[in-house]
Amino acid sequence: MEELIVELRLFLELLDHEYLTSTVREKKAVITNILLRIQSSKGFDVKDHAQKQETANSLPAPPQMPLPEIPQPWLPPDSGPPPLPTSSLPEGYYEEAVPLSPGKAPEYITSNYDSDAMSSSYESYDEEEEDGKGKKTRHQWPSEEASMDLVKDAKICAFLLRKKRFGQWTKLLCVIKDTKLLCYKSSKDQQPQMELPLQGCNITYIPKDSKKKKHELKITQQGTDPLVLAVQSKEQAEQWLKVIKEAYSGCSGPVDSECPPPPSSPVHKAELEKKLSSERPSSDGEGVVENGITTCNGKEQVKRKKSSKSEAKGTVSKVTGKKITKIISLGKKKPSTDEQTSSAEEDVPTCGYLNVLSNSRWRERWCRVKDNKLIFHKDRTDLKTHIVSIPLRGCEVIPGLDSKHPLTFRLLRNGQEVAVLEASSSEDMGRWIGILLAETGSSTDPEALHYDYIDVEMSASVIQTAKQTFCFMNRRVISANPYLGGTSNGYAHPSGTALHYDDVPCINGSLKGKKPPVASNGVTGKGKTLSSQPKKADPAAVVKRTGSNAAQYKYGKNRVEADAKRLQTKEEELLKRKEALRNRLAQLRKERKDLRAAIEVNAGRKPQAILEEKLKQLEEECRQKEAERVSLELELTEVKESLKKALAGGVTLGLAIEPKSGTSSPQSPVFRHRTLENSPISSCDTSDTEGPVPVNSAAVLKKSQAAPGSSPCRGHVLRKAKEWELKNGT
C-alpha cells in the first residue's frame, strides 16, 4: 500500500508536466485530494509540488519511504511569488509558458540570449556553442494573473519569436484556442494583435542548422504572407505540431497525419503535392515537396551520396534530418469575418487594391471605404489593423498627377494634399472617383474634372464608370434611356443640374429586378442641355448589344463628336498659321537675297558693315521662323493623327460630324463632300466660355433618322448612277 501511494504520487508529479484536458485535470485534482487524505491519515510527509520545483536544484531529493528518524531539512519561508518587472525587458529576454494546472498560477520559463542570436541579418559560420547560454530559470506570475482570460482555455501557449519581413524578430504571446492561433503583443493585452485560423494552413518545421539559426515553425496560408515562429528546441516544435493537429482534427474524429478536406471541395493528395512542389522556396531551410517530405535543392544534392550509407543502416543523416518537414493540410481556407462583410455582395464594391504614394514611394495597399472614411490596410487579410484612416467629408477629388502615372487621383482638404492614389485601370479609377465623390458629399460632376494625362477613350470609360458608381452610392436609378419617362428615372445630380447620358441603348431584358438598370459605356455631355422636350424613342432604333456592334460601347458618342470638332478647329488654326509662316519665310528669304546683292555692290565701302549687321539679324530671324515651322509641322501631324482616330470612332458610332474634304476617304460612303456647317450638329448650341464642349445631339439625330429621303448614302448613290447614265449616253 505504501509503495502504491509513493508511485501514485510520482505519477501525479509527472502529469504536472503534460498537457491535459479540463476533464483529465479535474480527475487528477480528485485523485490528489484522496492521496492527501490517505497520506495525512497514514502519517506521510507531504510537500507542495511548487516548493519541490523551487528547491529541486539546491536540495537533495526527498526520501521515497517515510524516515521519521531523519530530521526535516530547513526550508526558507515562502515569501510569495516575485513581482513583475516594472522596467522594460532587455532585448534578449525570452519566456515560454508552462501548461496550466488546477489551482496554480501560470509559470513561464525565461532565458536570455545575446544580441547576435536575436538577429538574422548577419550569419556566423562559427560552430562553437557557449555552455552557459540558454540556462532556464522559472518564476511565477502574481496570483491575480492566474485568472486571465488569455490562456484560460488554451490548448498550448508560449512566448515565441516572430520573424518580420526584413529579418528582425519580435516577441509575441502565442495561444492556440479552438482552431485559431492568437498572437498577443503582451500578456496584458485583451485583444490579439493577429488572429490566424489554422484551417487551410500548411505548417512546416525547419530545424536549426547553424549557430545563428533557430528552430522555426512556418505557417503558410494561401494568399497571405507566411508566418514564421521561432521555438527553443525540436521537442517544443513537435509539441506545437501535435497540438495544432489535435486542435483541428479533434472536431471531426481521430488525429491523422493529414486531415481530409471537407466533401464540398475535395482536394486529392496528388494535386496537393503538385501544388506544393510548384511553390518556390522562400527560406533557406525549405525545398521541393516530394511525397510529403521537403527536400532541399542545395546542400542535400551535394551530400546525397555521402548520406546514403547512414540511411541504409536505418539512421538519418544530419543534413537530411534538418530538411524533414511536417506538412499538415487542414482543408480549404475559410474567409474571415471581416472579409465576408467587406462589401463583397454590394452593387458597387467599396474596397480594392490601390497604389499609394507615401514618402516618395509607391506602395500597394488594400483600401476600403467605411463610415465616410478611407481606410488603408497593409493586406487584404489584415483587416483588424489599419495603417491610416482618412475622413472623407470636406475632401476634394482631383484626378491626375503626371504623365508617368496617368491613372492617378488625389484627395485635397483645404488645398492641402491628403493622399495620392493610383488605380490599375480606367474602370477602377472611375469606380474610385465615383465612390469618393459620393462619400465626400461633393456636388462636382465627374466630367467637370480635368483629365489631363489620359486620352479620349480612357477618359470616356473613367467618366462613365464614375457616374454609374456615384448613382449606385447614392441609391439613384439610371434609366436605360434618359429621354424616356420623367426626370425621376434620370440621373439626379446633387447640385440640381440635370445630367443627360448618351442615347446609346443598353439591355433592359437582361437586367433583373434586384439591381437597378445601368447605363452603357457612353459619356455624358457637359454644359447646356437641349431645350426640346424628350420624345418617345423609336423602338426600331434600339440596338441589341451583340458581338458585331460591341465596339460602339467602347467610346462615348458625344465626347468623340466634341473632340473631333475641337481637333478640326485646331487643325484649321494650325493650317492658317502654317500659311502665314510660309509667306513670312518667303519674304525673309527675298530680303536676305537682296541684302547679299547689296553687300556685293558695296564691297569695301562704309555701308557694308551696316548691311552685314542687317543680314545677320535677318538670318537669325530666318532660323527662328524655320524652327517654328518645324514645330508647327510636328504639331499639325499630331493633330491630324488624333483627328483621324476620332473620325474612325465616329464612323463606328454613326456620328453626324464629317471630316474636311481634304482628309476624306473616297472608299467610305459616310465621308460626304460637305462642310461641317451643313451638318445637323451645327444646329445645337455648343457655345461656352471655355471653348468647344461635348453636346447631346440625340434629338437632332432622331430627326435626321426620321426622314428616310434625306439619307446621304442614298443621295450619293443616285448621283453616281446619274453620272454613269450620262457617260453611257455620250
From Swiss-Prot:
Gene3D superfamilies on file: Pleckstrin-homology domain (PH domain)/Phosphotyrosine-binding domain (PTB) (2.30.29.30)
Q: Which residues form a coiled coil?
A: 557-648
Q: Report TM segments.
A: none
Q: Where is this region: Interaction with F-actin?
A: 594-637
Q: Where in the cell is it found?
A: Cytoplasm, Cytoskeleton, Stress fiber
Q: Where is composition skewed (Pro residues) in this entry?
A: 60-85
Post-translation changes: Phosphorylated on tyrosine residues by SRC.
Short motif (SH2-binding 2): ranges: 451-456
State the span of motif (SH2-binding 1). Answer: 94-97
UniProt cross-references to InterPro entries, sorted A to Z: AFAP, PH-like_dom_sf, PH_domain
Residue ranges of the motif SH3-binding: 71-74
Q: Biological process (GO) annotations?
A: regulation of signal transduction
Q: Which domain of life is it from?
A: Eukaryota
Where do the record's region annotations for Disordered lie? Answer: 47-91, 119-140, 252-292, 512-537
Q: Which UniProt keywords apply?
A: Acetylation, Actin-binding, Coiled coil, Cytoplasm, Cytoskeleton, Phosphoprotein, Repeat
Sites where N-acetylmethionine occurs are at M1
Q: Which residues carry this modification: Phosphoserine?
A: S282, S283, S548, S664, S665, S668, S679, S687
What does the record say about tissue specificity? Answer: Low expression in normal breast epithelial cell line MCF-10A and in tumorigenic breast cancer cell lines MCF-7, T-47D and ZR-75-1. Highly expressed in the invasive breast cancer cell lines MDA-MB-231 and MDA-MB-435. Overexpressed in prostate carcinoma.
Something else the entry says is: Knockdown in MDA-MB-231 cells resulted in loss of actin stress fibers, decreased adhesion and spreading on fibronectin.
Q: What is the protein's given name?
A: Actin filament-associated protein 1
Q: What is the lineage of its organism?
A: Eukaryota, Metazoa, Chordata, Craniata, Vertebrata
**Gene encoding this polypeptide?**
AFAP1
